[in-house]
A protein has these predicted regions:
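ABC-type nucleotide-binding domain
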Residues: 359-360, 366-608
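Membrane-integrated ABC transporters
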Residues: 1-40, 47-99, 105, 112-117, ...
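Hydrophobic alpha-helical transmembrane bundles that constitute the permease/transmembrane domains
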Residues: 27-35, 100-111, 163-166, 170-185, ...
Length: 608
């Protein structure tokens, strides 16, 4: 329960007004229920002509010292006067109408209590999803290198859905049932405190049975949600690798793997559901046992004519039965909540993940790039493995510096340090003499444009993708950017021109077309610093020519850091740096490095 209260403390404050209304309407519903069932006593007295009916000859003054006797006497007096005035039959009708009226008010209050909790339930779930999404977009790239996409998607969908179906669906029970239990229990104490105290002996025993099952349920739920993440990860990997799966005729192998994971998930869910289904029959059985015990003890009191009359005892039983239902629902919530808390733990792995790329407390705001980018004694490692070692490099404004080297030499990591996708462990990365860790992150990244090997586009129109991240761009500016990127002509050949949807990740376009749309996006942003990460790799000759032409236009008057796989694309760079095992081993122009006869020349000869 402590964990559950902590969850409510985190997410409930914005919805306090709905909570207050829910509590008020639940209290009203409980009071009306007590009063409506109290009408049963005079009805039973009239029907069965019980001893004591009509014995009250005058009203007793109100007093808290003997409140029970006052209420019993005065109610009997009014009923007696009513019988004398209109007769027993009409009195029964009037009491019945009173019962119907109070029941109508009670059901109205019940509806309002449920209606006011719905905005709270749906709002909290929305807030959790929003917090998750914002956290995902703010976390550094390093976090996602250690996490599977399918697992993250599972937490956004399956775990949030479990919180909604388990914890949020229990809010009504948890804010309604304790109020009903308190009011009904007070009524039971008022009717017969001796009989009520006797029934309390059995409550801890029943609660222990429920707790044993609930604790095991949470453990099983954590395992089930973890297996659901494995299932989603398998689906995500399959969708991303369908071409390879088909090329290697591995459909059967992947089907078997998925069936194995899916069957494990089914087994775990089955265990959770079976244990959860124990809630209703167990609470039903325990409630019946309690009623039987009270019937026996209370029946003895009635037969011996001690403390309770027959109609009052029946009213007591009605109230006891009324309290059993919220107790059963309360126990049901006790089974649901552990499942939800298991999902909250998994969600919190993202929400409470450390954001290592933090905004400086007093950021230096920079709106333009004036002089140079400098890597000063920069070293960087992933985990315990050093990827960059003592890098020293100065990139003057307006110059183009190319990075070459074999895969894993640290080229992409080096350029990722400029926009602070990662932070260095040793040394500094400076822009105009200011450490990038002192700059506002938004200001820093606004200075930089990226065109990568993987042309990442969104399921949107051409115009939506080109203007992504650029506010208030005019159509004229969009078209101009597309023309410079050699994209305008093929865009206009589509059905709706710039309003044509390009599909998931630009799937309706060729590789060269996707890359040119990315270049148009970078041109529209008009950044002073440009990072090109193997932007022409994996393209055919014609597409490469068009993309390279667009890149050369984009690079005009910009400071460019280019990672190149094909050395022919960087011959005109002002400086070429050759990286090997995390160090710059050679640097110079193309001609200088060829003349040097070292690592760069060997790479060049391999591609010739």
């Amino acid at each position: 329960m402590k964990e559950f209260l902590q969850v409510l403390k985190r997410f409930l404050p914005p919805y306090k007004k709905y909570l207050a209304l829910t509590i008020v309407f639940n209290m009203l519903s409980a009071l009306l229920n007590i009063f409506s069932f109290a009408a049963l006593i005079p009805i039973l007295q009239i029907l069965f002509r019980t001893e004591g009916t009509g014995t009250a000859t005058q009203l007793m003054p109100w007093s808290f010292d003997n409140l029970k006797d006052v209420i019993s006497n005065n109610a009997d007096y009014y009923v007696t006067q009513l019988i004398h005035s209109v007769g027993s039959t009409t009195t029964l009708l009037l009491i019945g109408l009173f019962l119907a009226f109070t029941t109508m008010l009670k059901t109205g209050a019940y509806f309002l209590s449920s209606a006011t909790i719905i905005p709270m339930r749906t709002g909290i779930v929305r807030d959790i999803r929003n917090q998750l999404y914002r956290k995902i977009t703010s976390l550094p790239l390093g976090f996602f290198s250690d996490e599977r996409k399918g697992d993250i998607i599972a937490r956004m969908t399956g775990d949030v859905g479990e919180v909604e179906s388990s914890i949020m669906s229990s809010l009504d029970m948890l804010f309604k049932n304790p109020i009903l239990i308190i009011f009904y229990f007070s009524a039971l104490l008022f009717i017969s405190w001796q009989l009520t105290l006797f029934t309390l002996i059995f409550v801890p025993i029943f609660g222990w049975f429920m707790g044993v099952v609930g604790r095991k349920l949470k453990q099983n739920s954590i395992k089930a949600q973890s297996l659901w993440s494995d299932t989603m990860s398998q689906v995500e990997e399959t969708l991303g690798g369908l071409r390879i799966i088909k090329a290697f005729c591995a459909e059967d192998k992947m089907n078997e793997r998925f069936d194995r994971i899916n069957s494990s998930y089914r087994t775990a869910v089955q265990r959770v559901n079976i244990r959860q289904q124990l809630a209703h029959p167990m609470s039903e059985f325990l409630g019946t046992v309690l009623i039987i015990i009270v019937l026996w003890v209370g029946g003895v009191l009635v037969l011996d004519k001690q403390m309770l009359s027959g109609p009052t005892f029946i009213y007591y039983l009605v109230m006891l039965y009324s309290i059993i239902n919220p107790l059963k629902e309360f126990s049901k919530a006790g089974y649901n909540i552990p499942k939800g808390l298991a999902s909250v733990e998994r969600i919190d792995k993202i929400l409470k993940a450390e954001d290592t790329i933090k905004e400086p407390e007093n950021p230096v705001h920079i709106k333009s790039f004036e002089h140079q980018i400098e890597f000063r004694h920069v070293s960087f490692k992933y985990g315990e493995q050093w990827v960059l070692k003592d890098i020293n490099l100065v990139i003057e404004k307006g110059k183009t510096v190319a990075l070459v080297g074999q895969s894993g030499s640290g080229k992409s990591t080096l350029v990722d340090l400029i926009p602070r996708y990662y932070d260095v462990q040793e040394g500094e990365v400076l822009i105009d003499g200011i450490d990038v860790r002192q700059l506002g992150i938004h200001d820093l990244r606004q200075l930089i444009g990226n065109v990568n090997q993987e042309a990442i586009l969104f399921n949107d129109s051409f115009i939506g993708n080109i203007t992504f991240g650029v506010e208030n761009a005019t159509m004229e500016q969009v078209e101009q950017a597309a023309r410079i990127a050699n994209a305008h002509d093929f865009i206009m050949q589509t059905e709706h021109g710039y309003d044509t949807n390009i599909g998931y990740r630009g799937g309706r376009l060729s590789g060269g077309q996707r890359q040119r749309v990315r270049i148009a996006r970078a041109i529209l942003k008009n950044p002073p610093i440009l990072i090109l990460d193997e932007a022409t790799s994996a393209l055919d000759t014609e597409s490469e020519r068009l993309v390279q032409d667009a890149l050369e236009r984009l690079m005009t008057s910009r400071t460019t850091v280019a990672i190149a796989h094909r050395l022919s694309t960087i011959k005109n760079a002002n400086e070429i740096c050759v990286l090997h095992e995390g160090r710059i081993v050679e640097r110079g122009t193309h001609d200088e490095l060829i003349a040097l006869g070292g690592y760069y020349r060997r790479l060049h000869e391999m591609q010739s």
